[in-house]
């Protein structure tokens, strides 16, 4: 039983690291104009599970990282209006900080397409990712927006309680 729990914990940590890396990659693409292939190559060789500037990064589930980044890039034209609808009308997505846009896009993609992960886990994980970059109030906004999007795509999960 302990072996199963340890295996699940390792997978969860690798997925959490993949989410953090995906948000960083999406941010880098938006701010720096890097292409997806360049970002994949850089993260594969320098970030995922390596030491960078004295910080050791957790090994990430590379396939999960690639799925989230590629999915956001492919679906961003459709994802952004979903996020805009969940935001306050006086604060559209274009006014949200770039790092938070990356968090919201990655979380929205995962909520719609990664049904293998419970919605509450997705929301919680991306709130944790947001905490790595922003203050508590902004992370609360991530929670509220992703919760709305989760209820749209995963109504069955919320109907069960």
Curated annotation (Swiss-Prot):
It holds the Pfam family NusB. It comes from the Bacteria. GO terms for biological process: DNA-templated transcription termination; transcription antitermination. GO terms for molecular function: RNA binding. Transmembrane segments: none annotated. One of its GO terms (cellular component) is cytosol. Keywords: RNA-binding, Transcription, Transcription antitermination, Transcription regulation. PANTHER family: ANTITERMINATION NUSB DOMAIN-CONTAINING PROTEIN (PTHR11078:SF3), N UTILIZATION SUBSTANCE PROTEIN B-RELATED (PTHR11078). Involved in transcription antitermination. Required for transcription of ribosomal RNA (rRNA) genes. Binds specifically to the boxA antiterminator sequence of the ribosomal RNA (rrn) operons. NCBIfam families: nusB (TIGR01951). Belongs to the NusB family. This is Transcription antitermination protein NusB. It comes from Nitrobacter winogradskyi (strain ATCC 25391 / DSM 10237 / CIP 104748 / NCIMB 11846 / Nb-255).
């Amino acid at each position: 039983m302990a072996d199963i729990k340890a295996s699940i914990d390792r997978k969860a940590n690798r997925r959490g690291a993949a989410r953090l890396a995906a948000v960083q990659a999406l941010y880098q693409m938006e701010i720096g104009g890097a292409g997806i292939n360049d970002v994949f190559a850089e993260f594969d060789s320098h970030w995922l599970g390596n030491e960078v500037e004295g910080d050791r990064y957790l090994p990430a589930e590379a396939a999960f990282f690639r799925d989230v980044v590629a999915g956001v890039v492919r679906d961003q034209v459709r994802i952004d209006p979903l996020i805009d609808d969940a935001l306050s009308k006086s604060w559209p997505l274009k006014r949200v900080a770039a790092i938070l846009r990356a968090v919201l896009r990655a979380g929205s993609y995962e909520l719609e397409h990664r049904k293998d992960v419970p919605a509450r886990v997705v929301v919680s994980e991306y709130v944790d990712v947001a905490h790595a970059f922003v203050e508590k109030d902004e992370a609360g906004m991530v929670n509220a927006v992703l919760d709305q999007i989760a209820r749209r795509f995963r109504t069955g999960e919320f109907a069960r309680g």
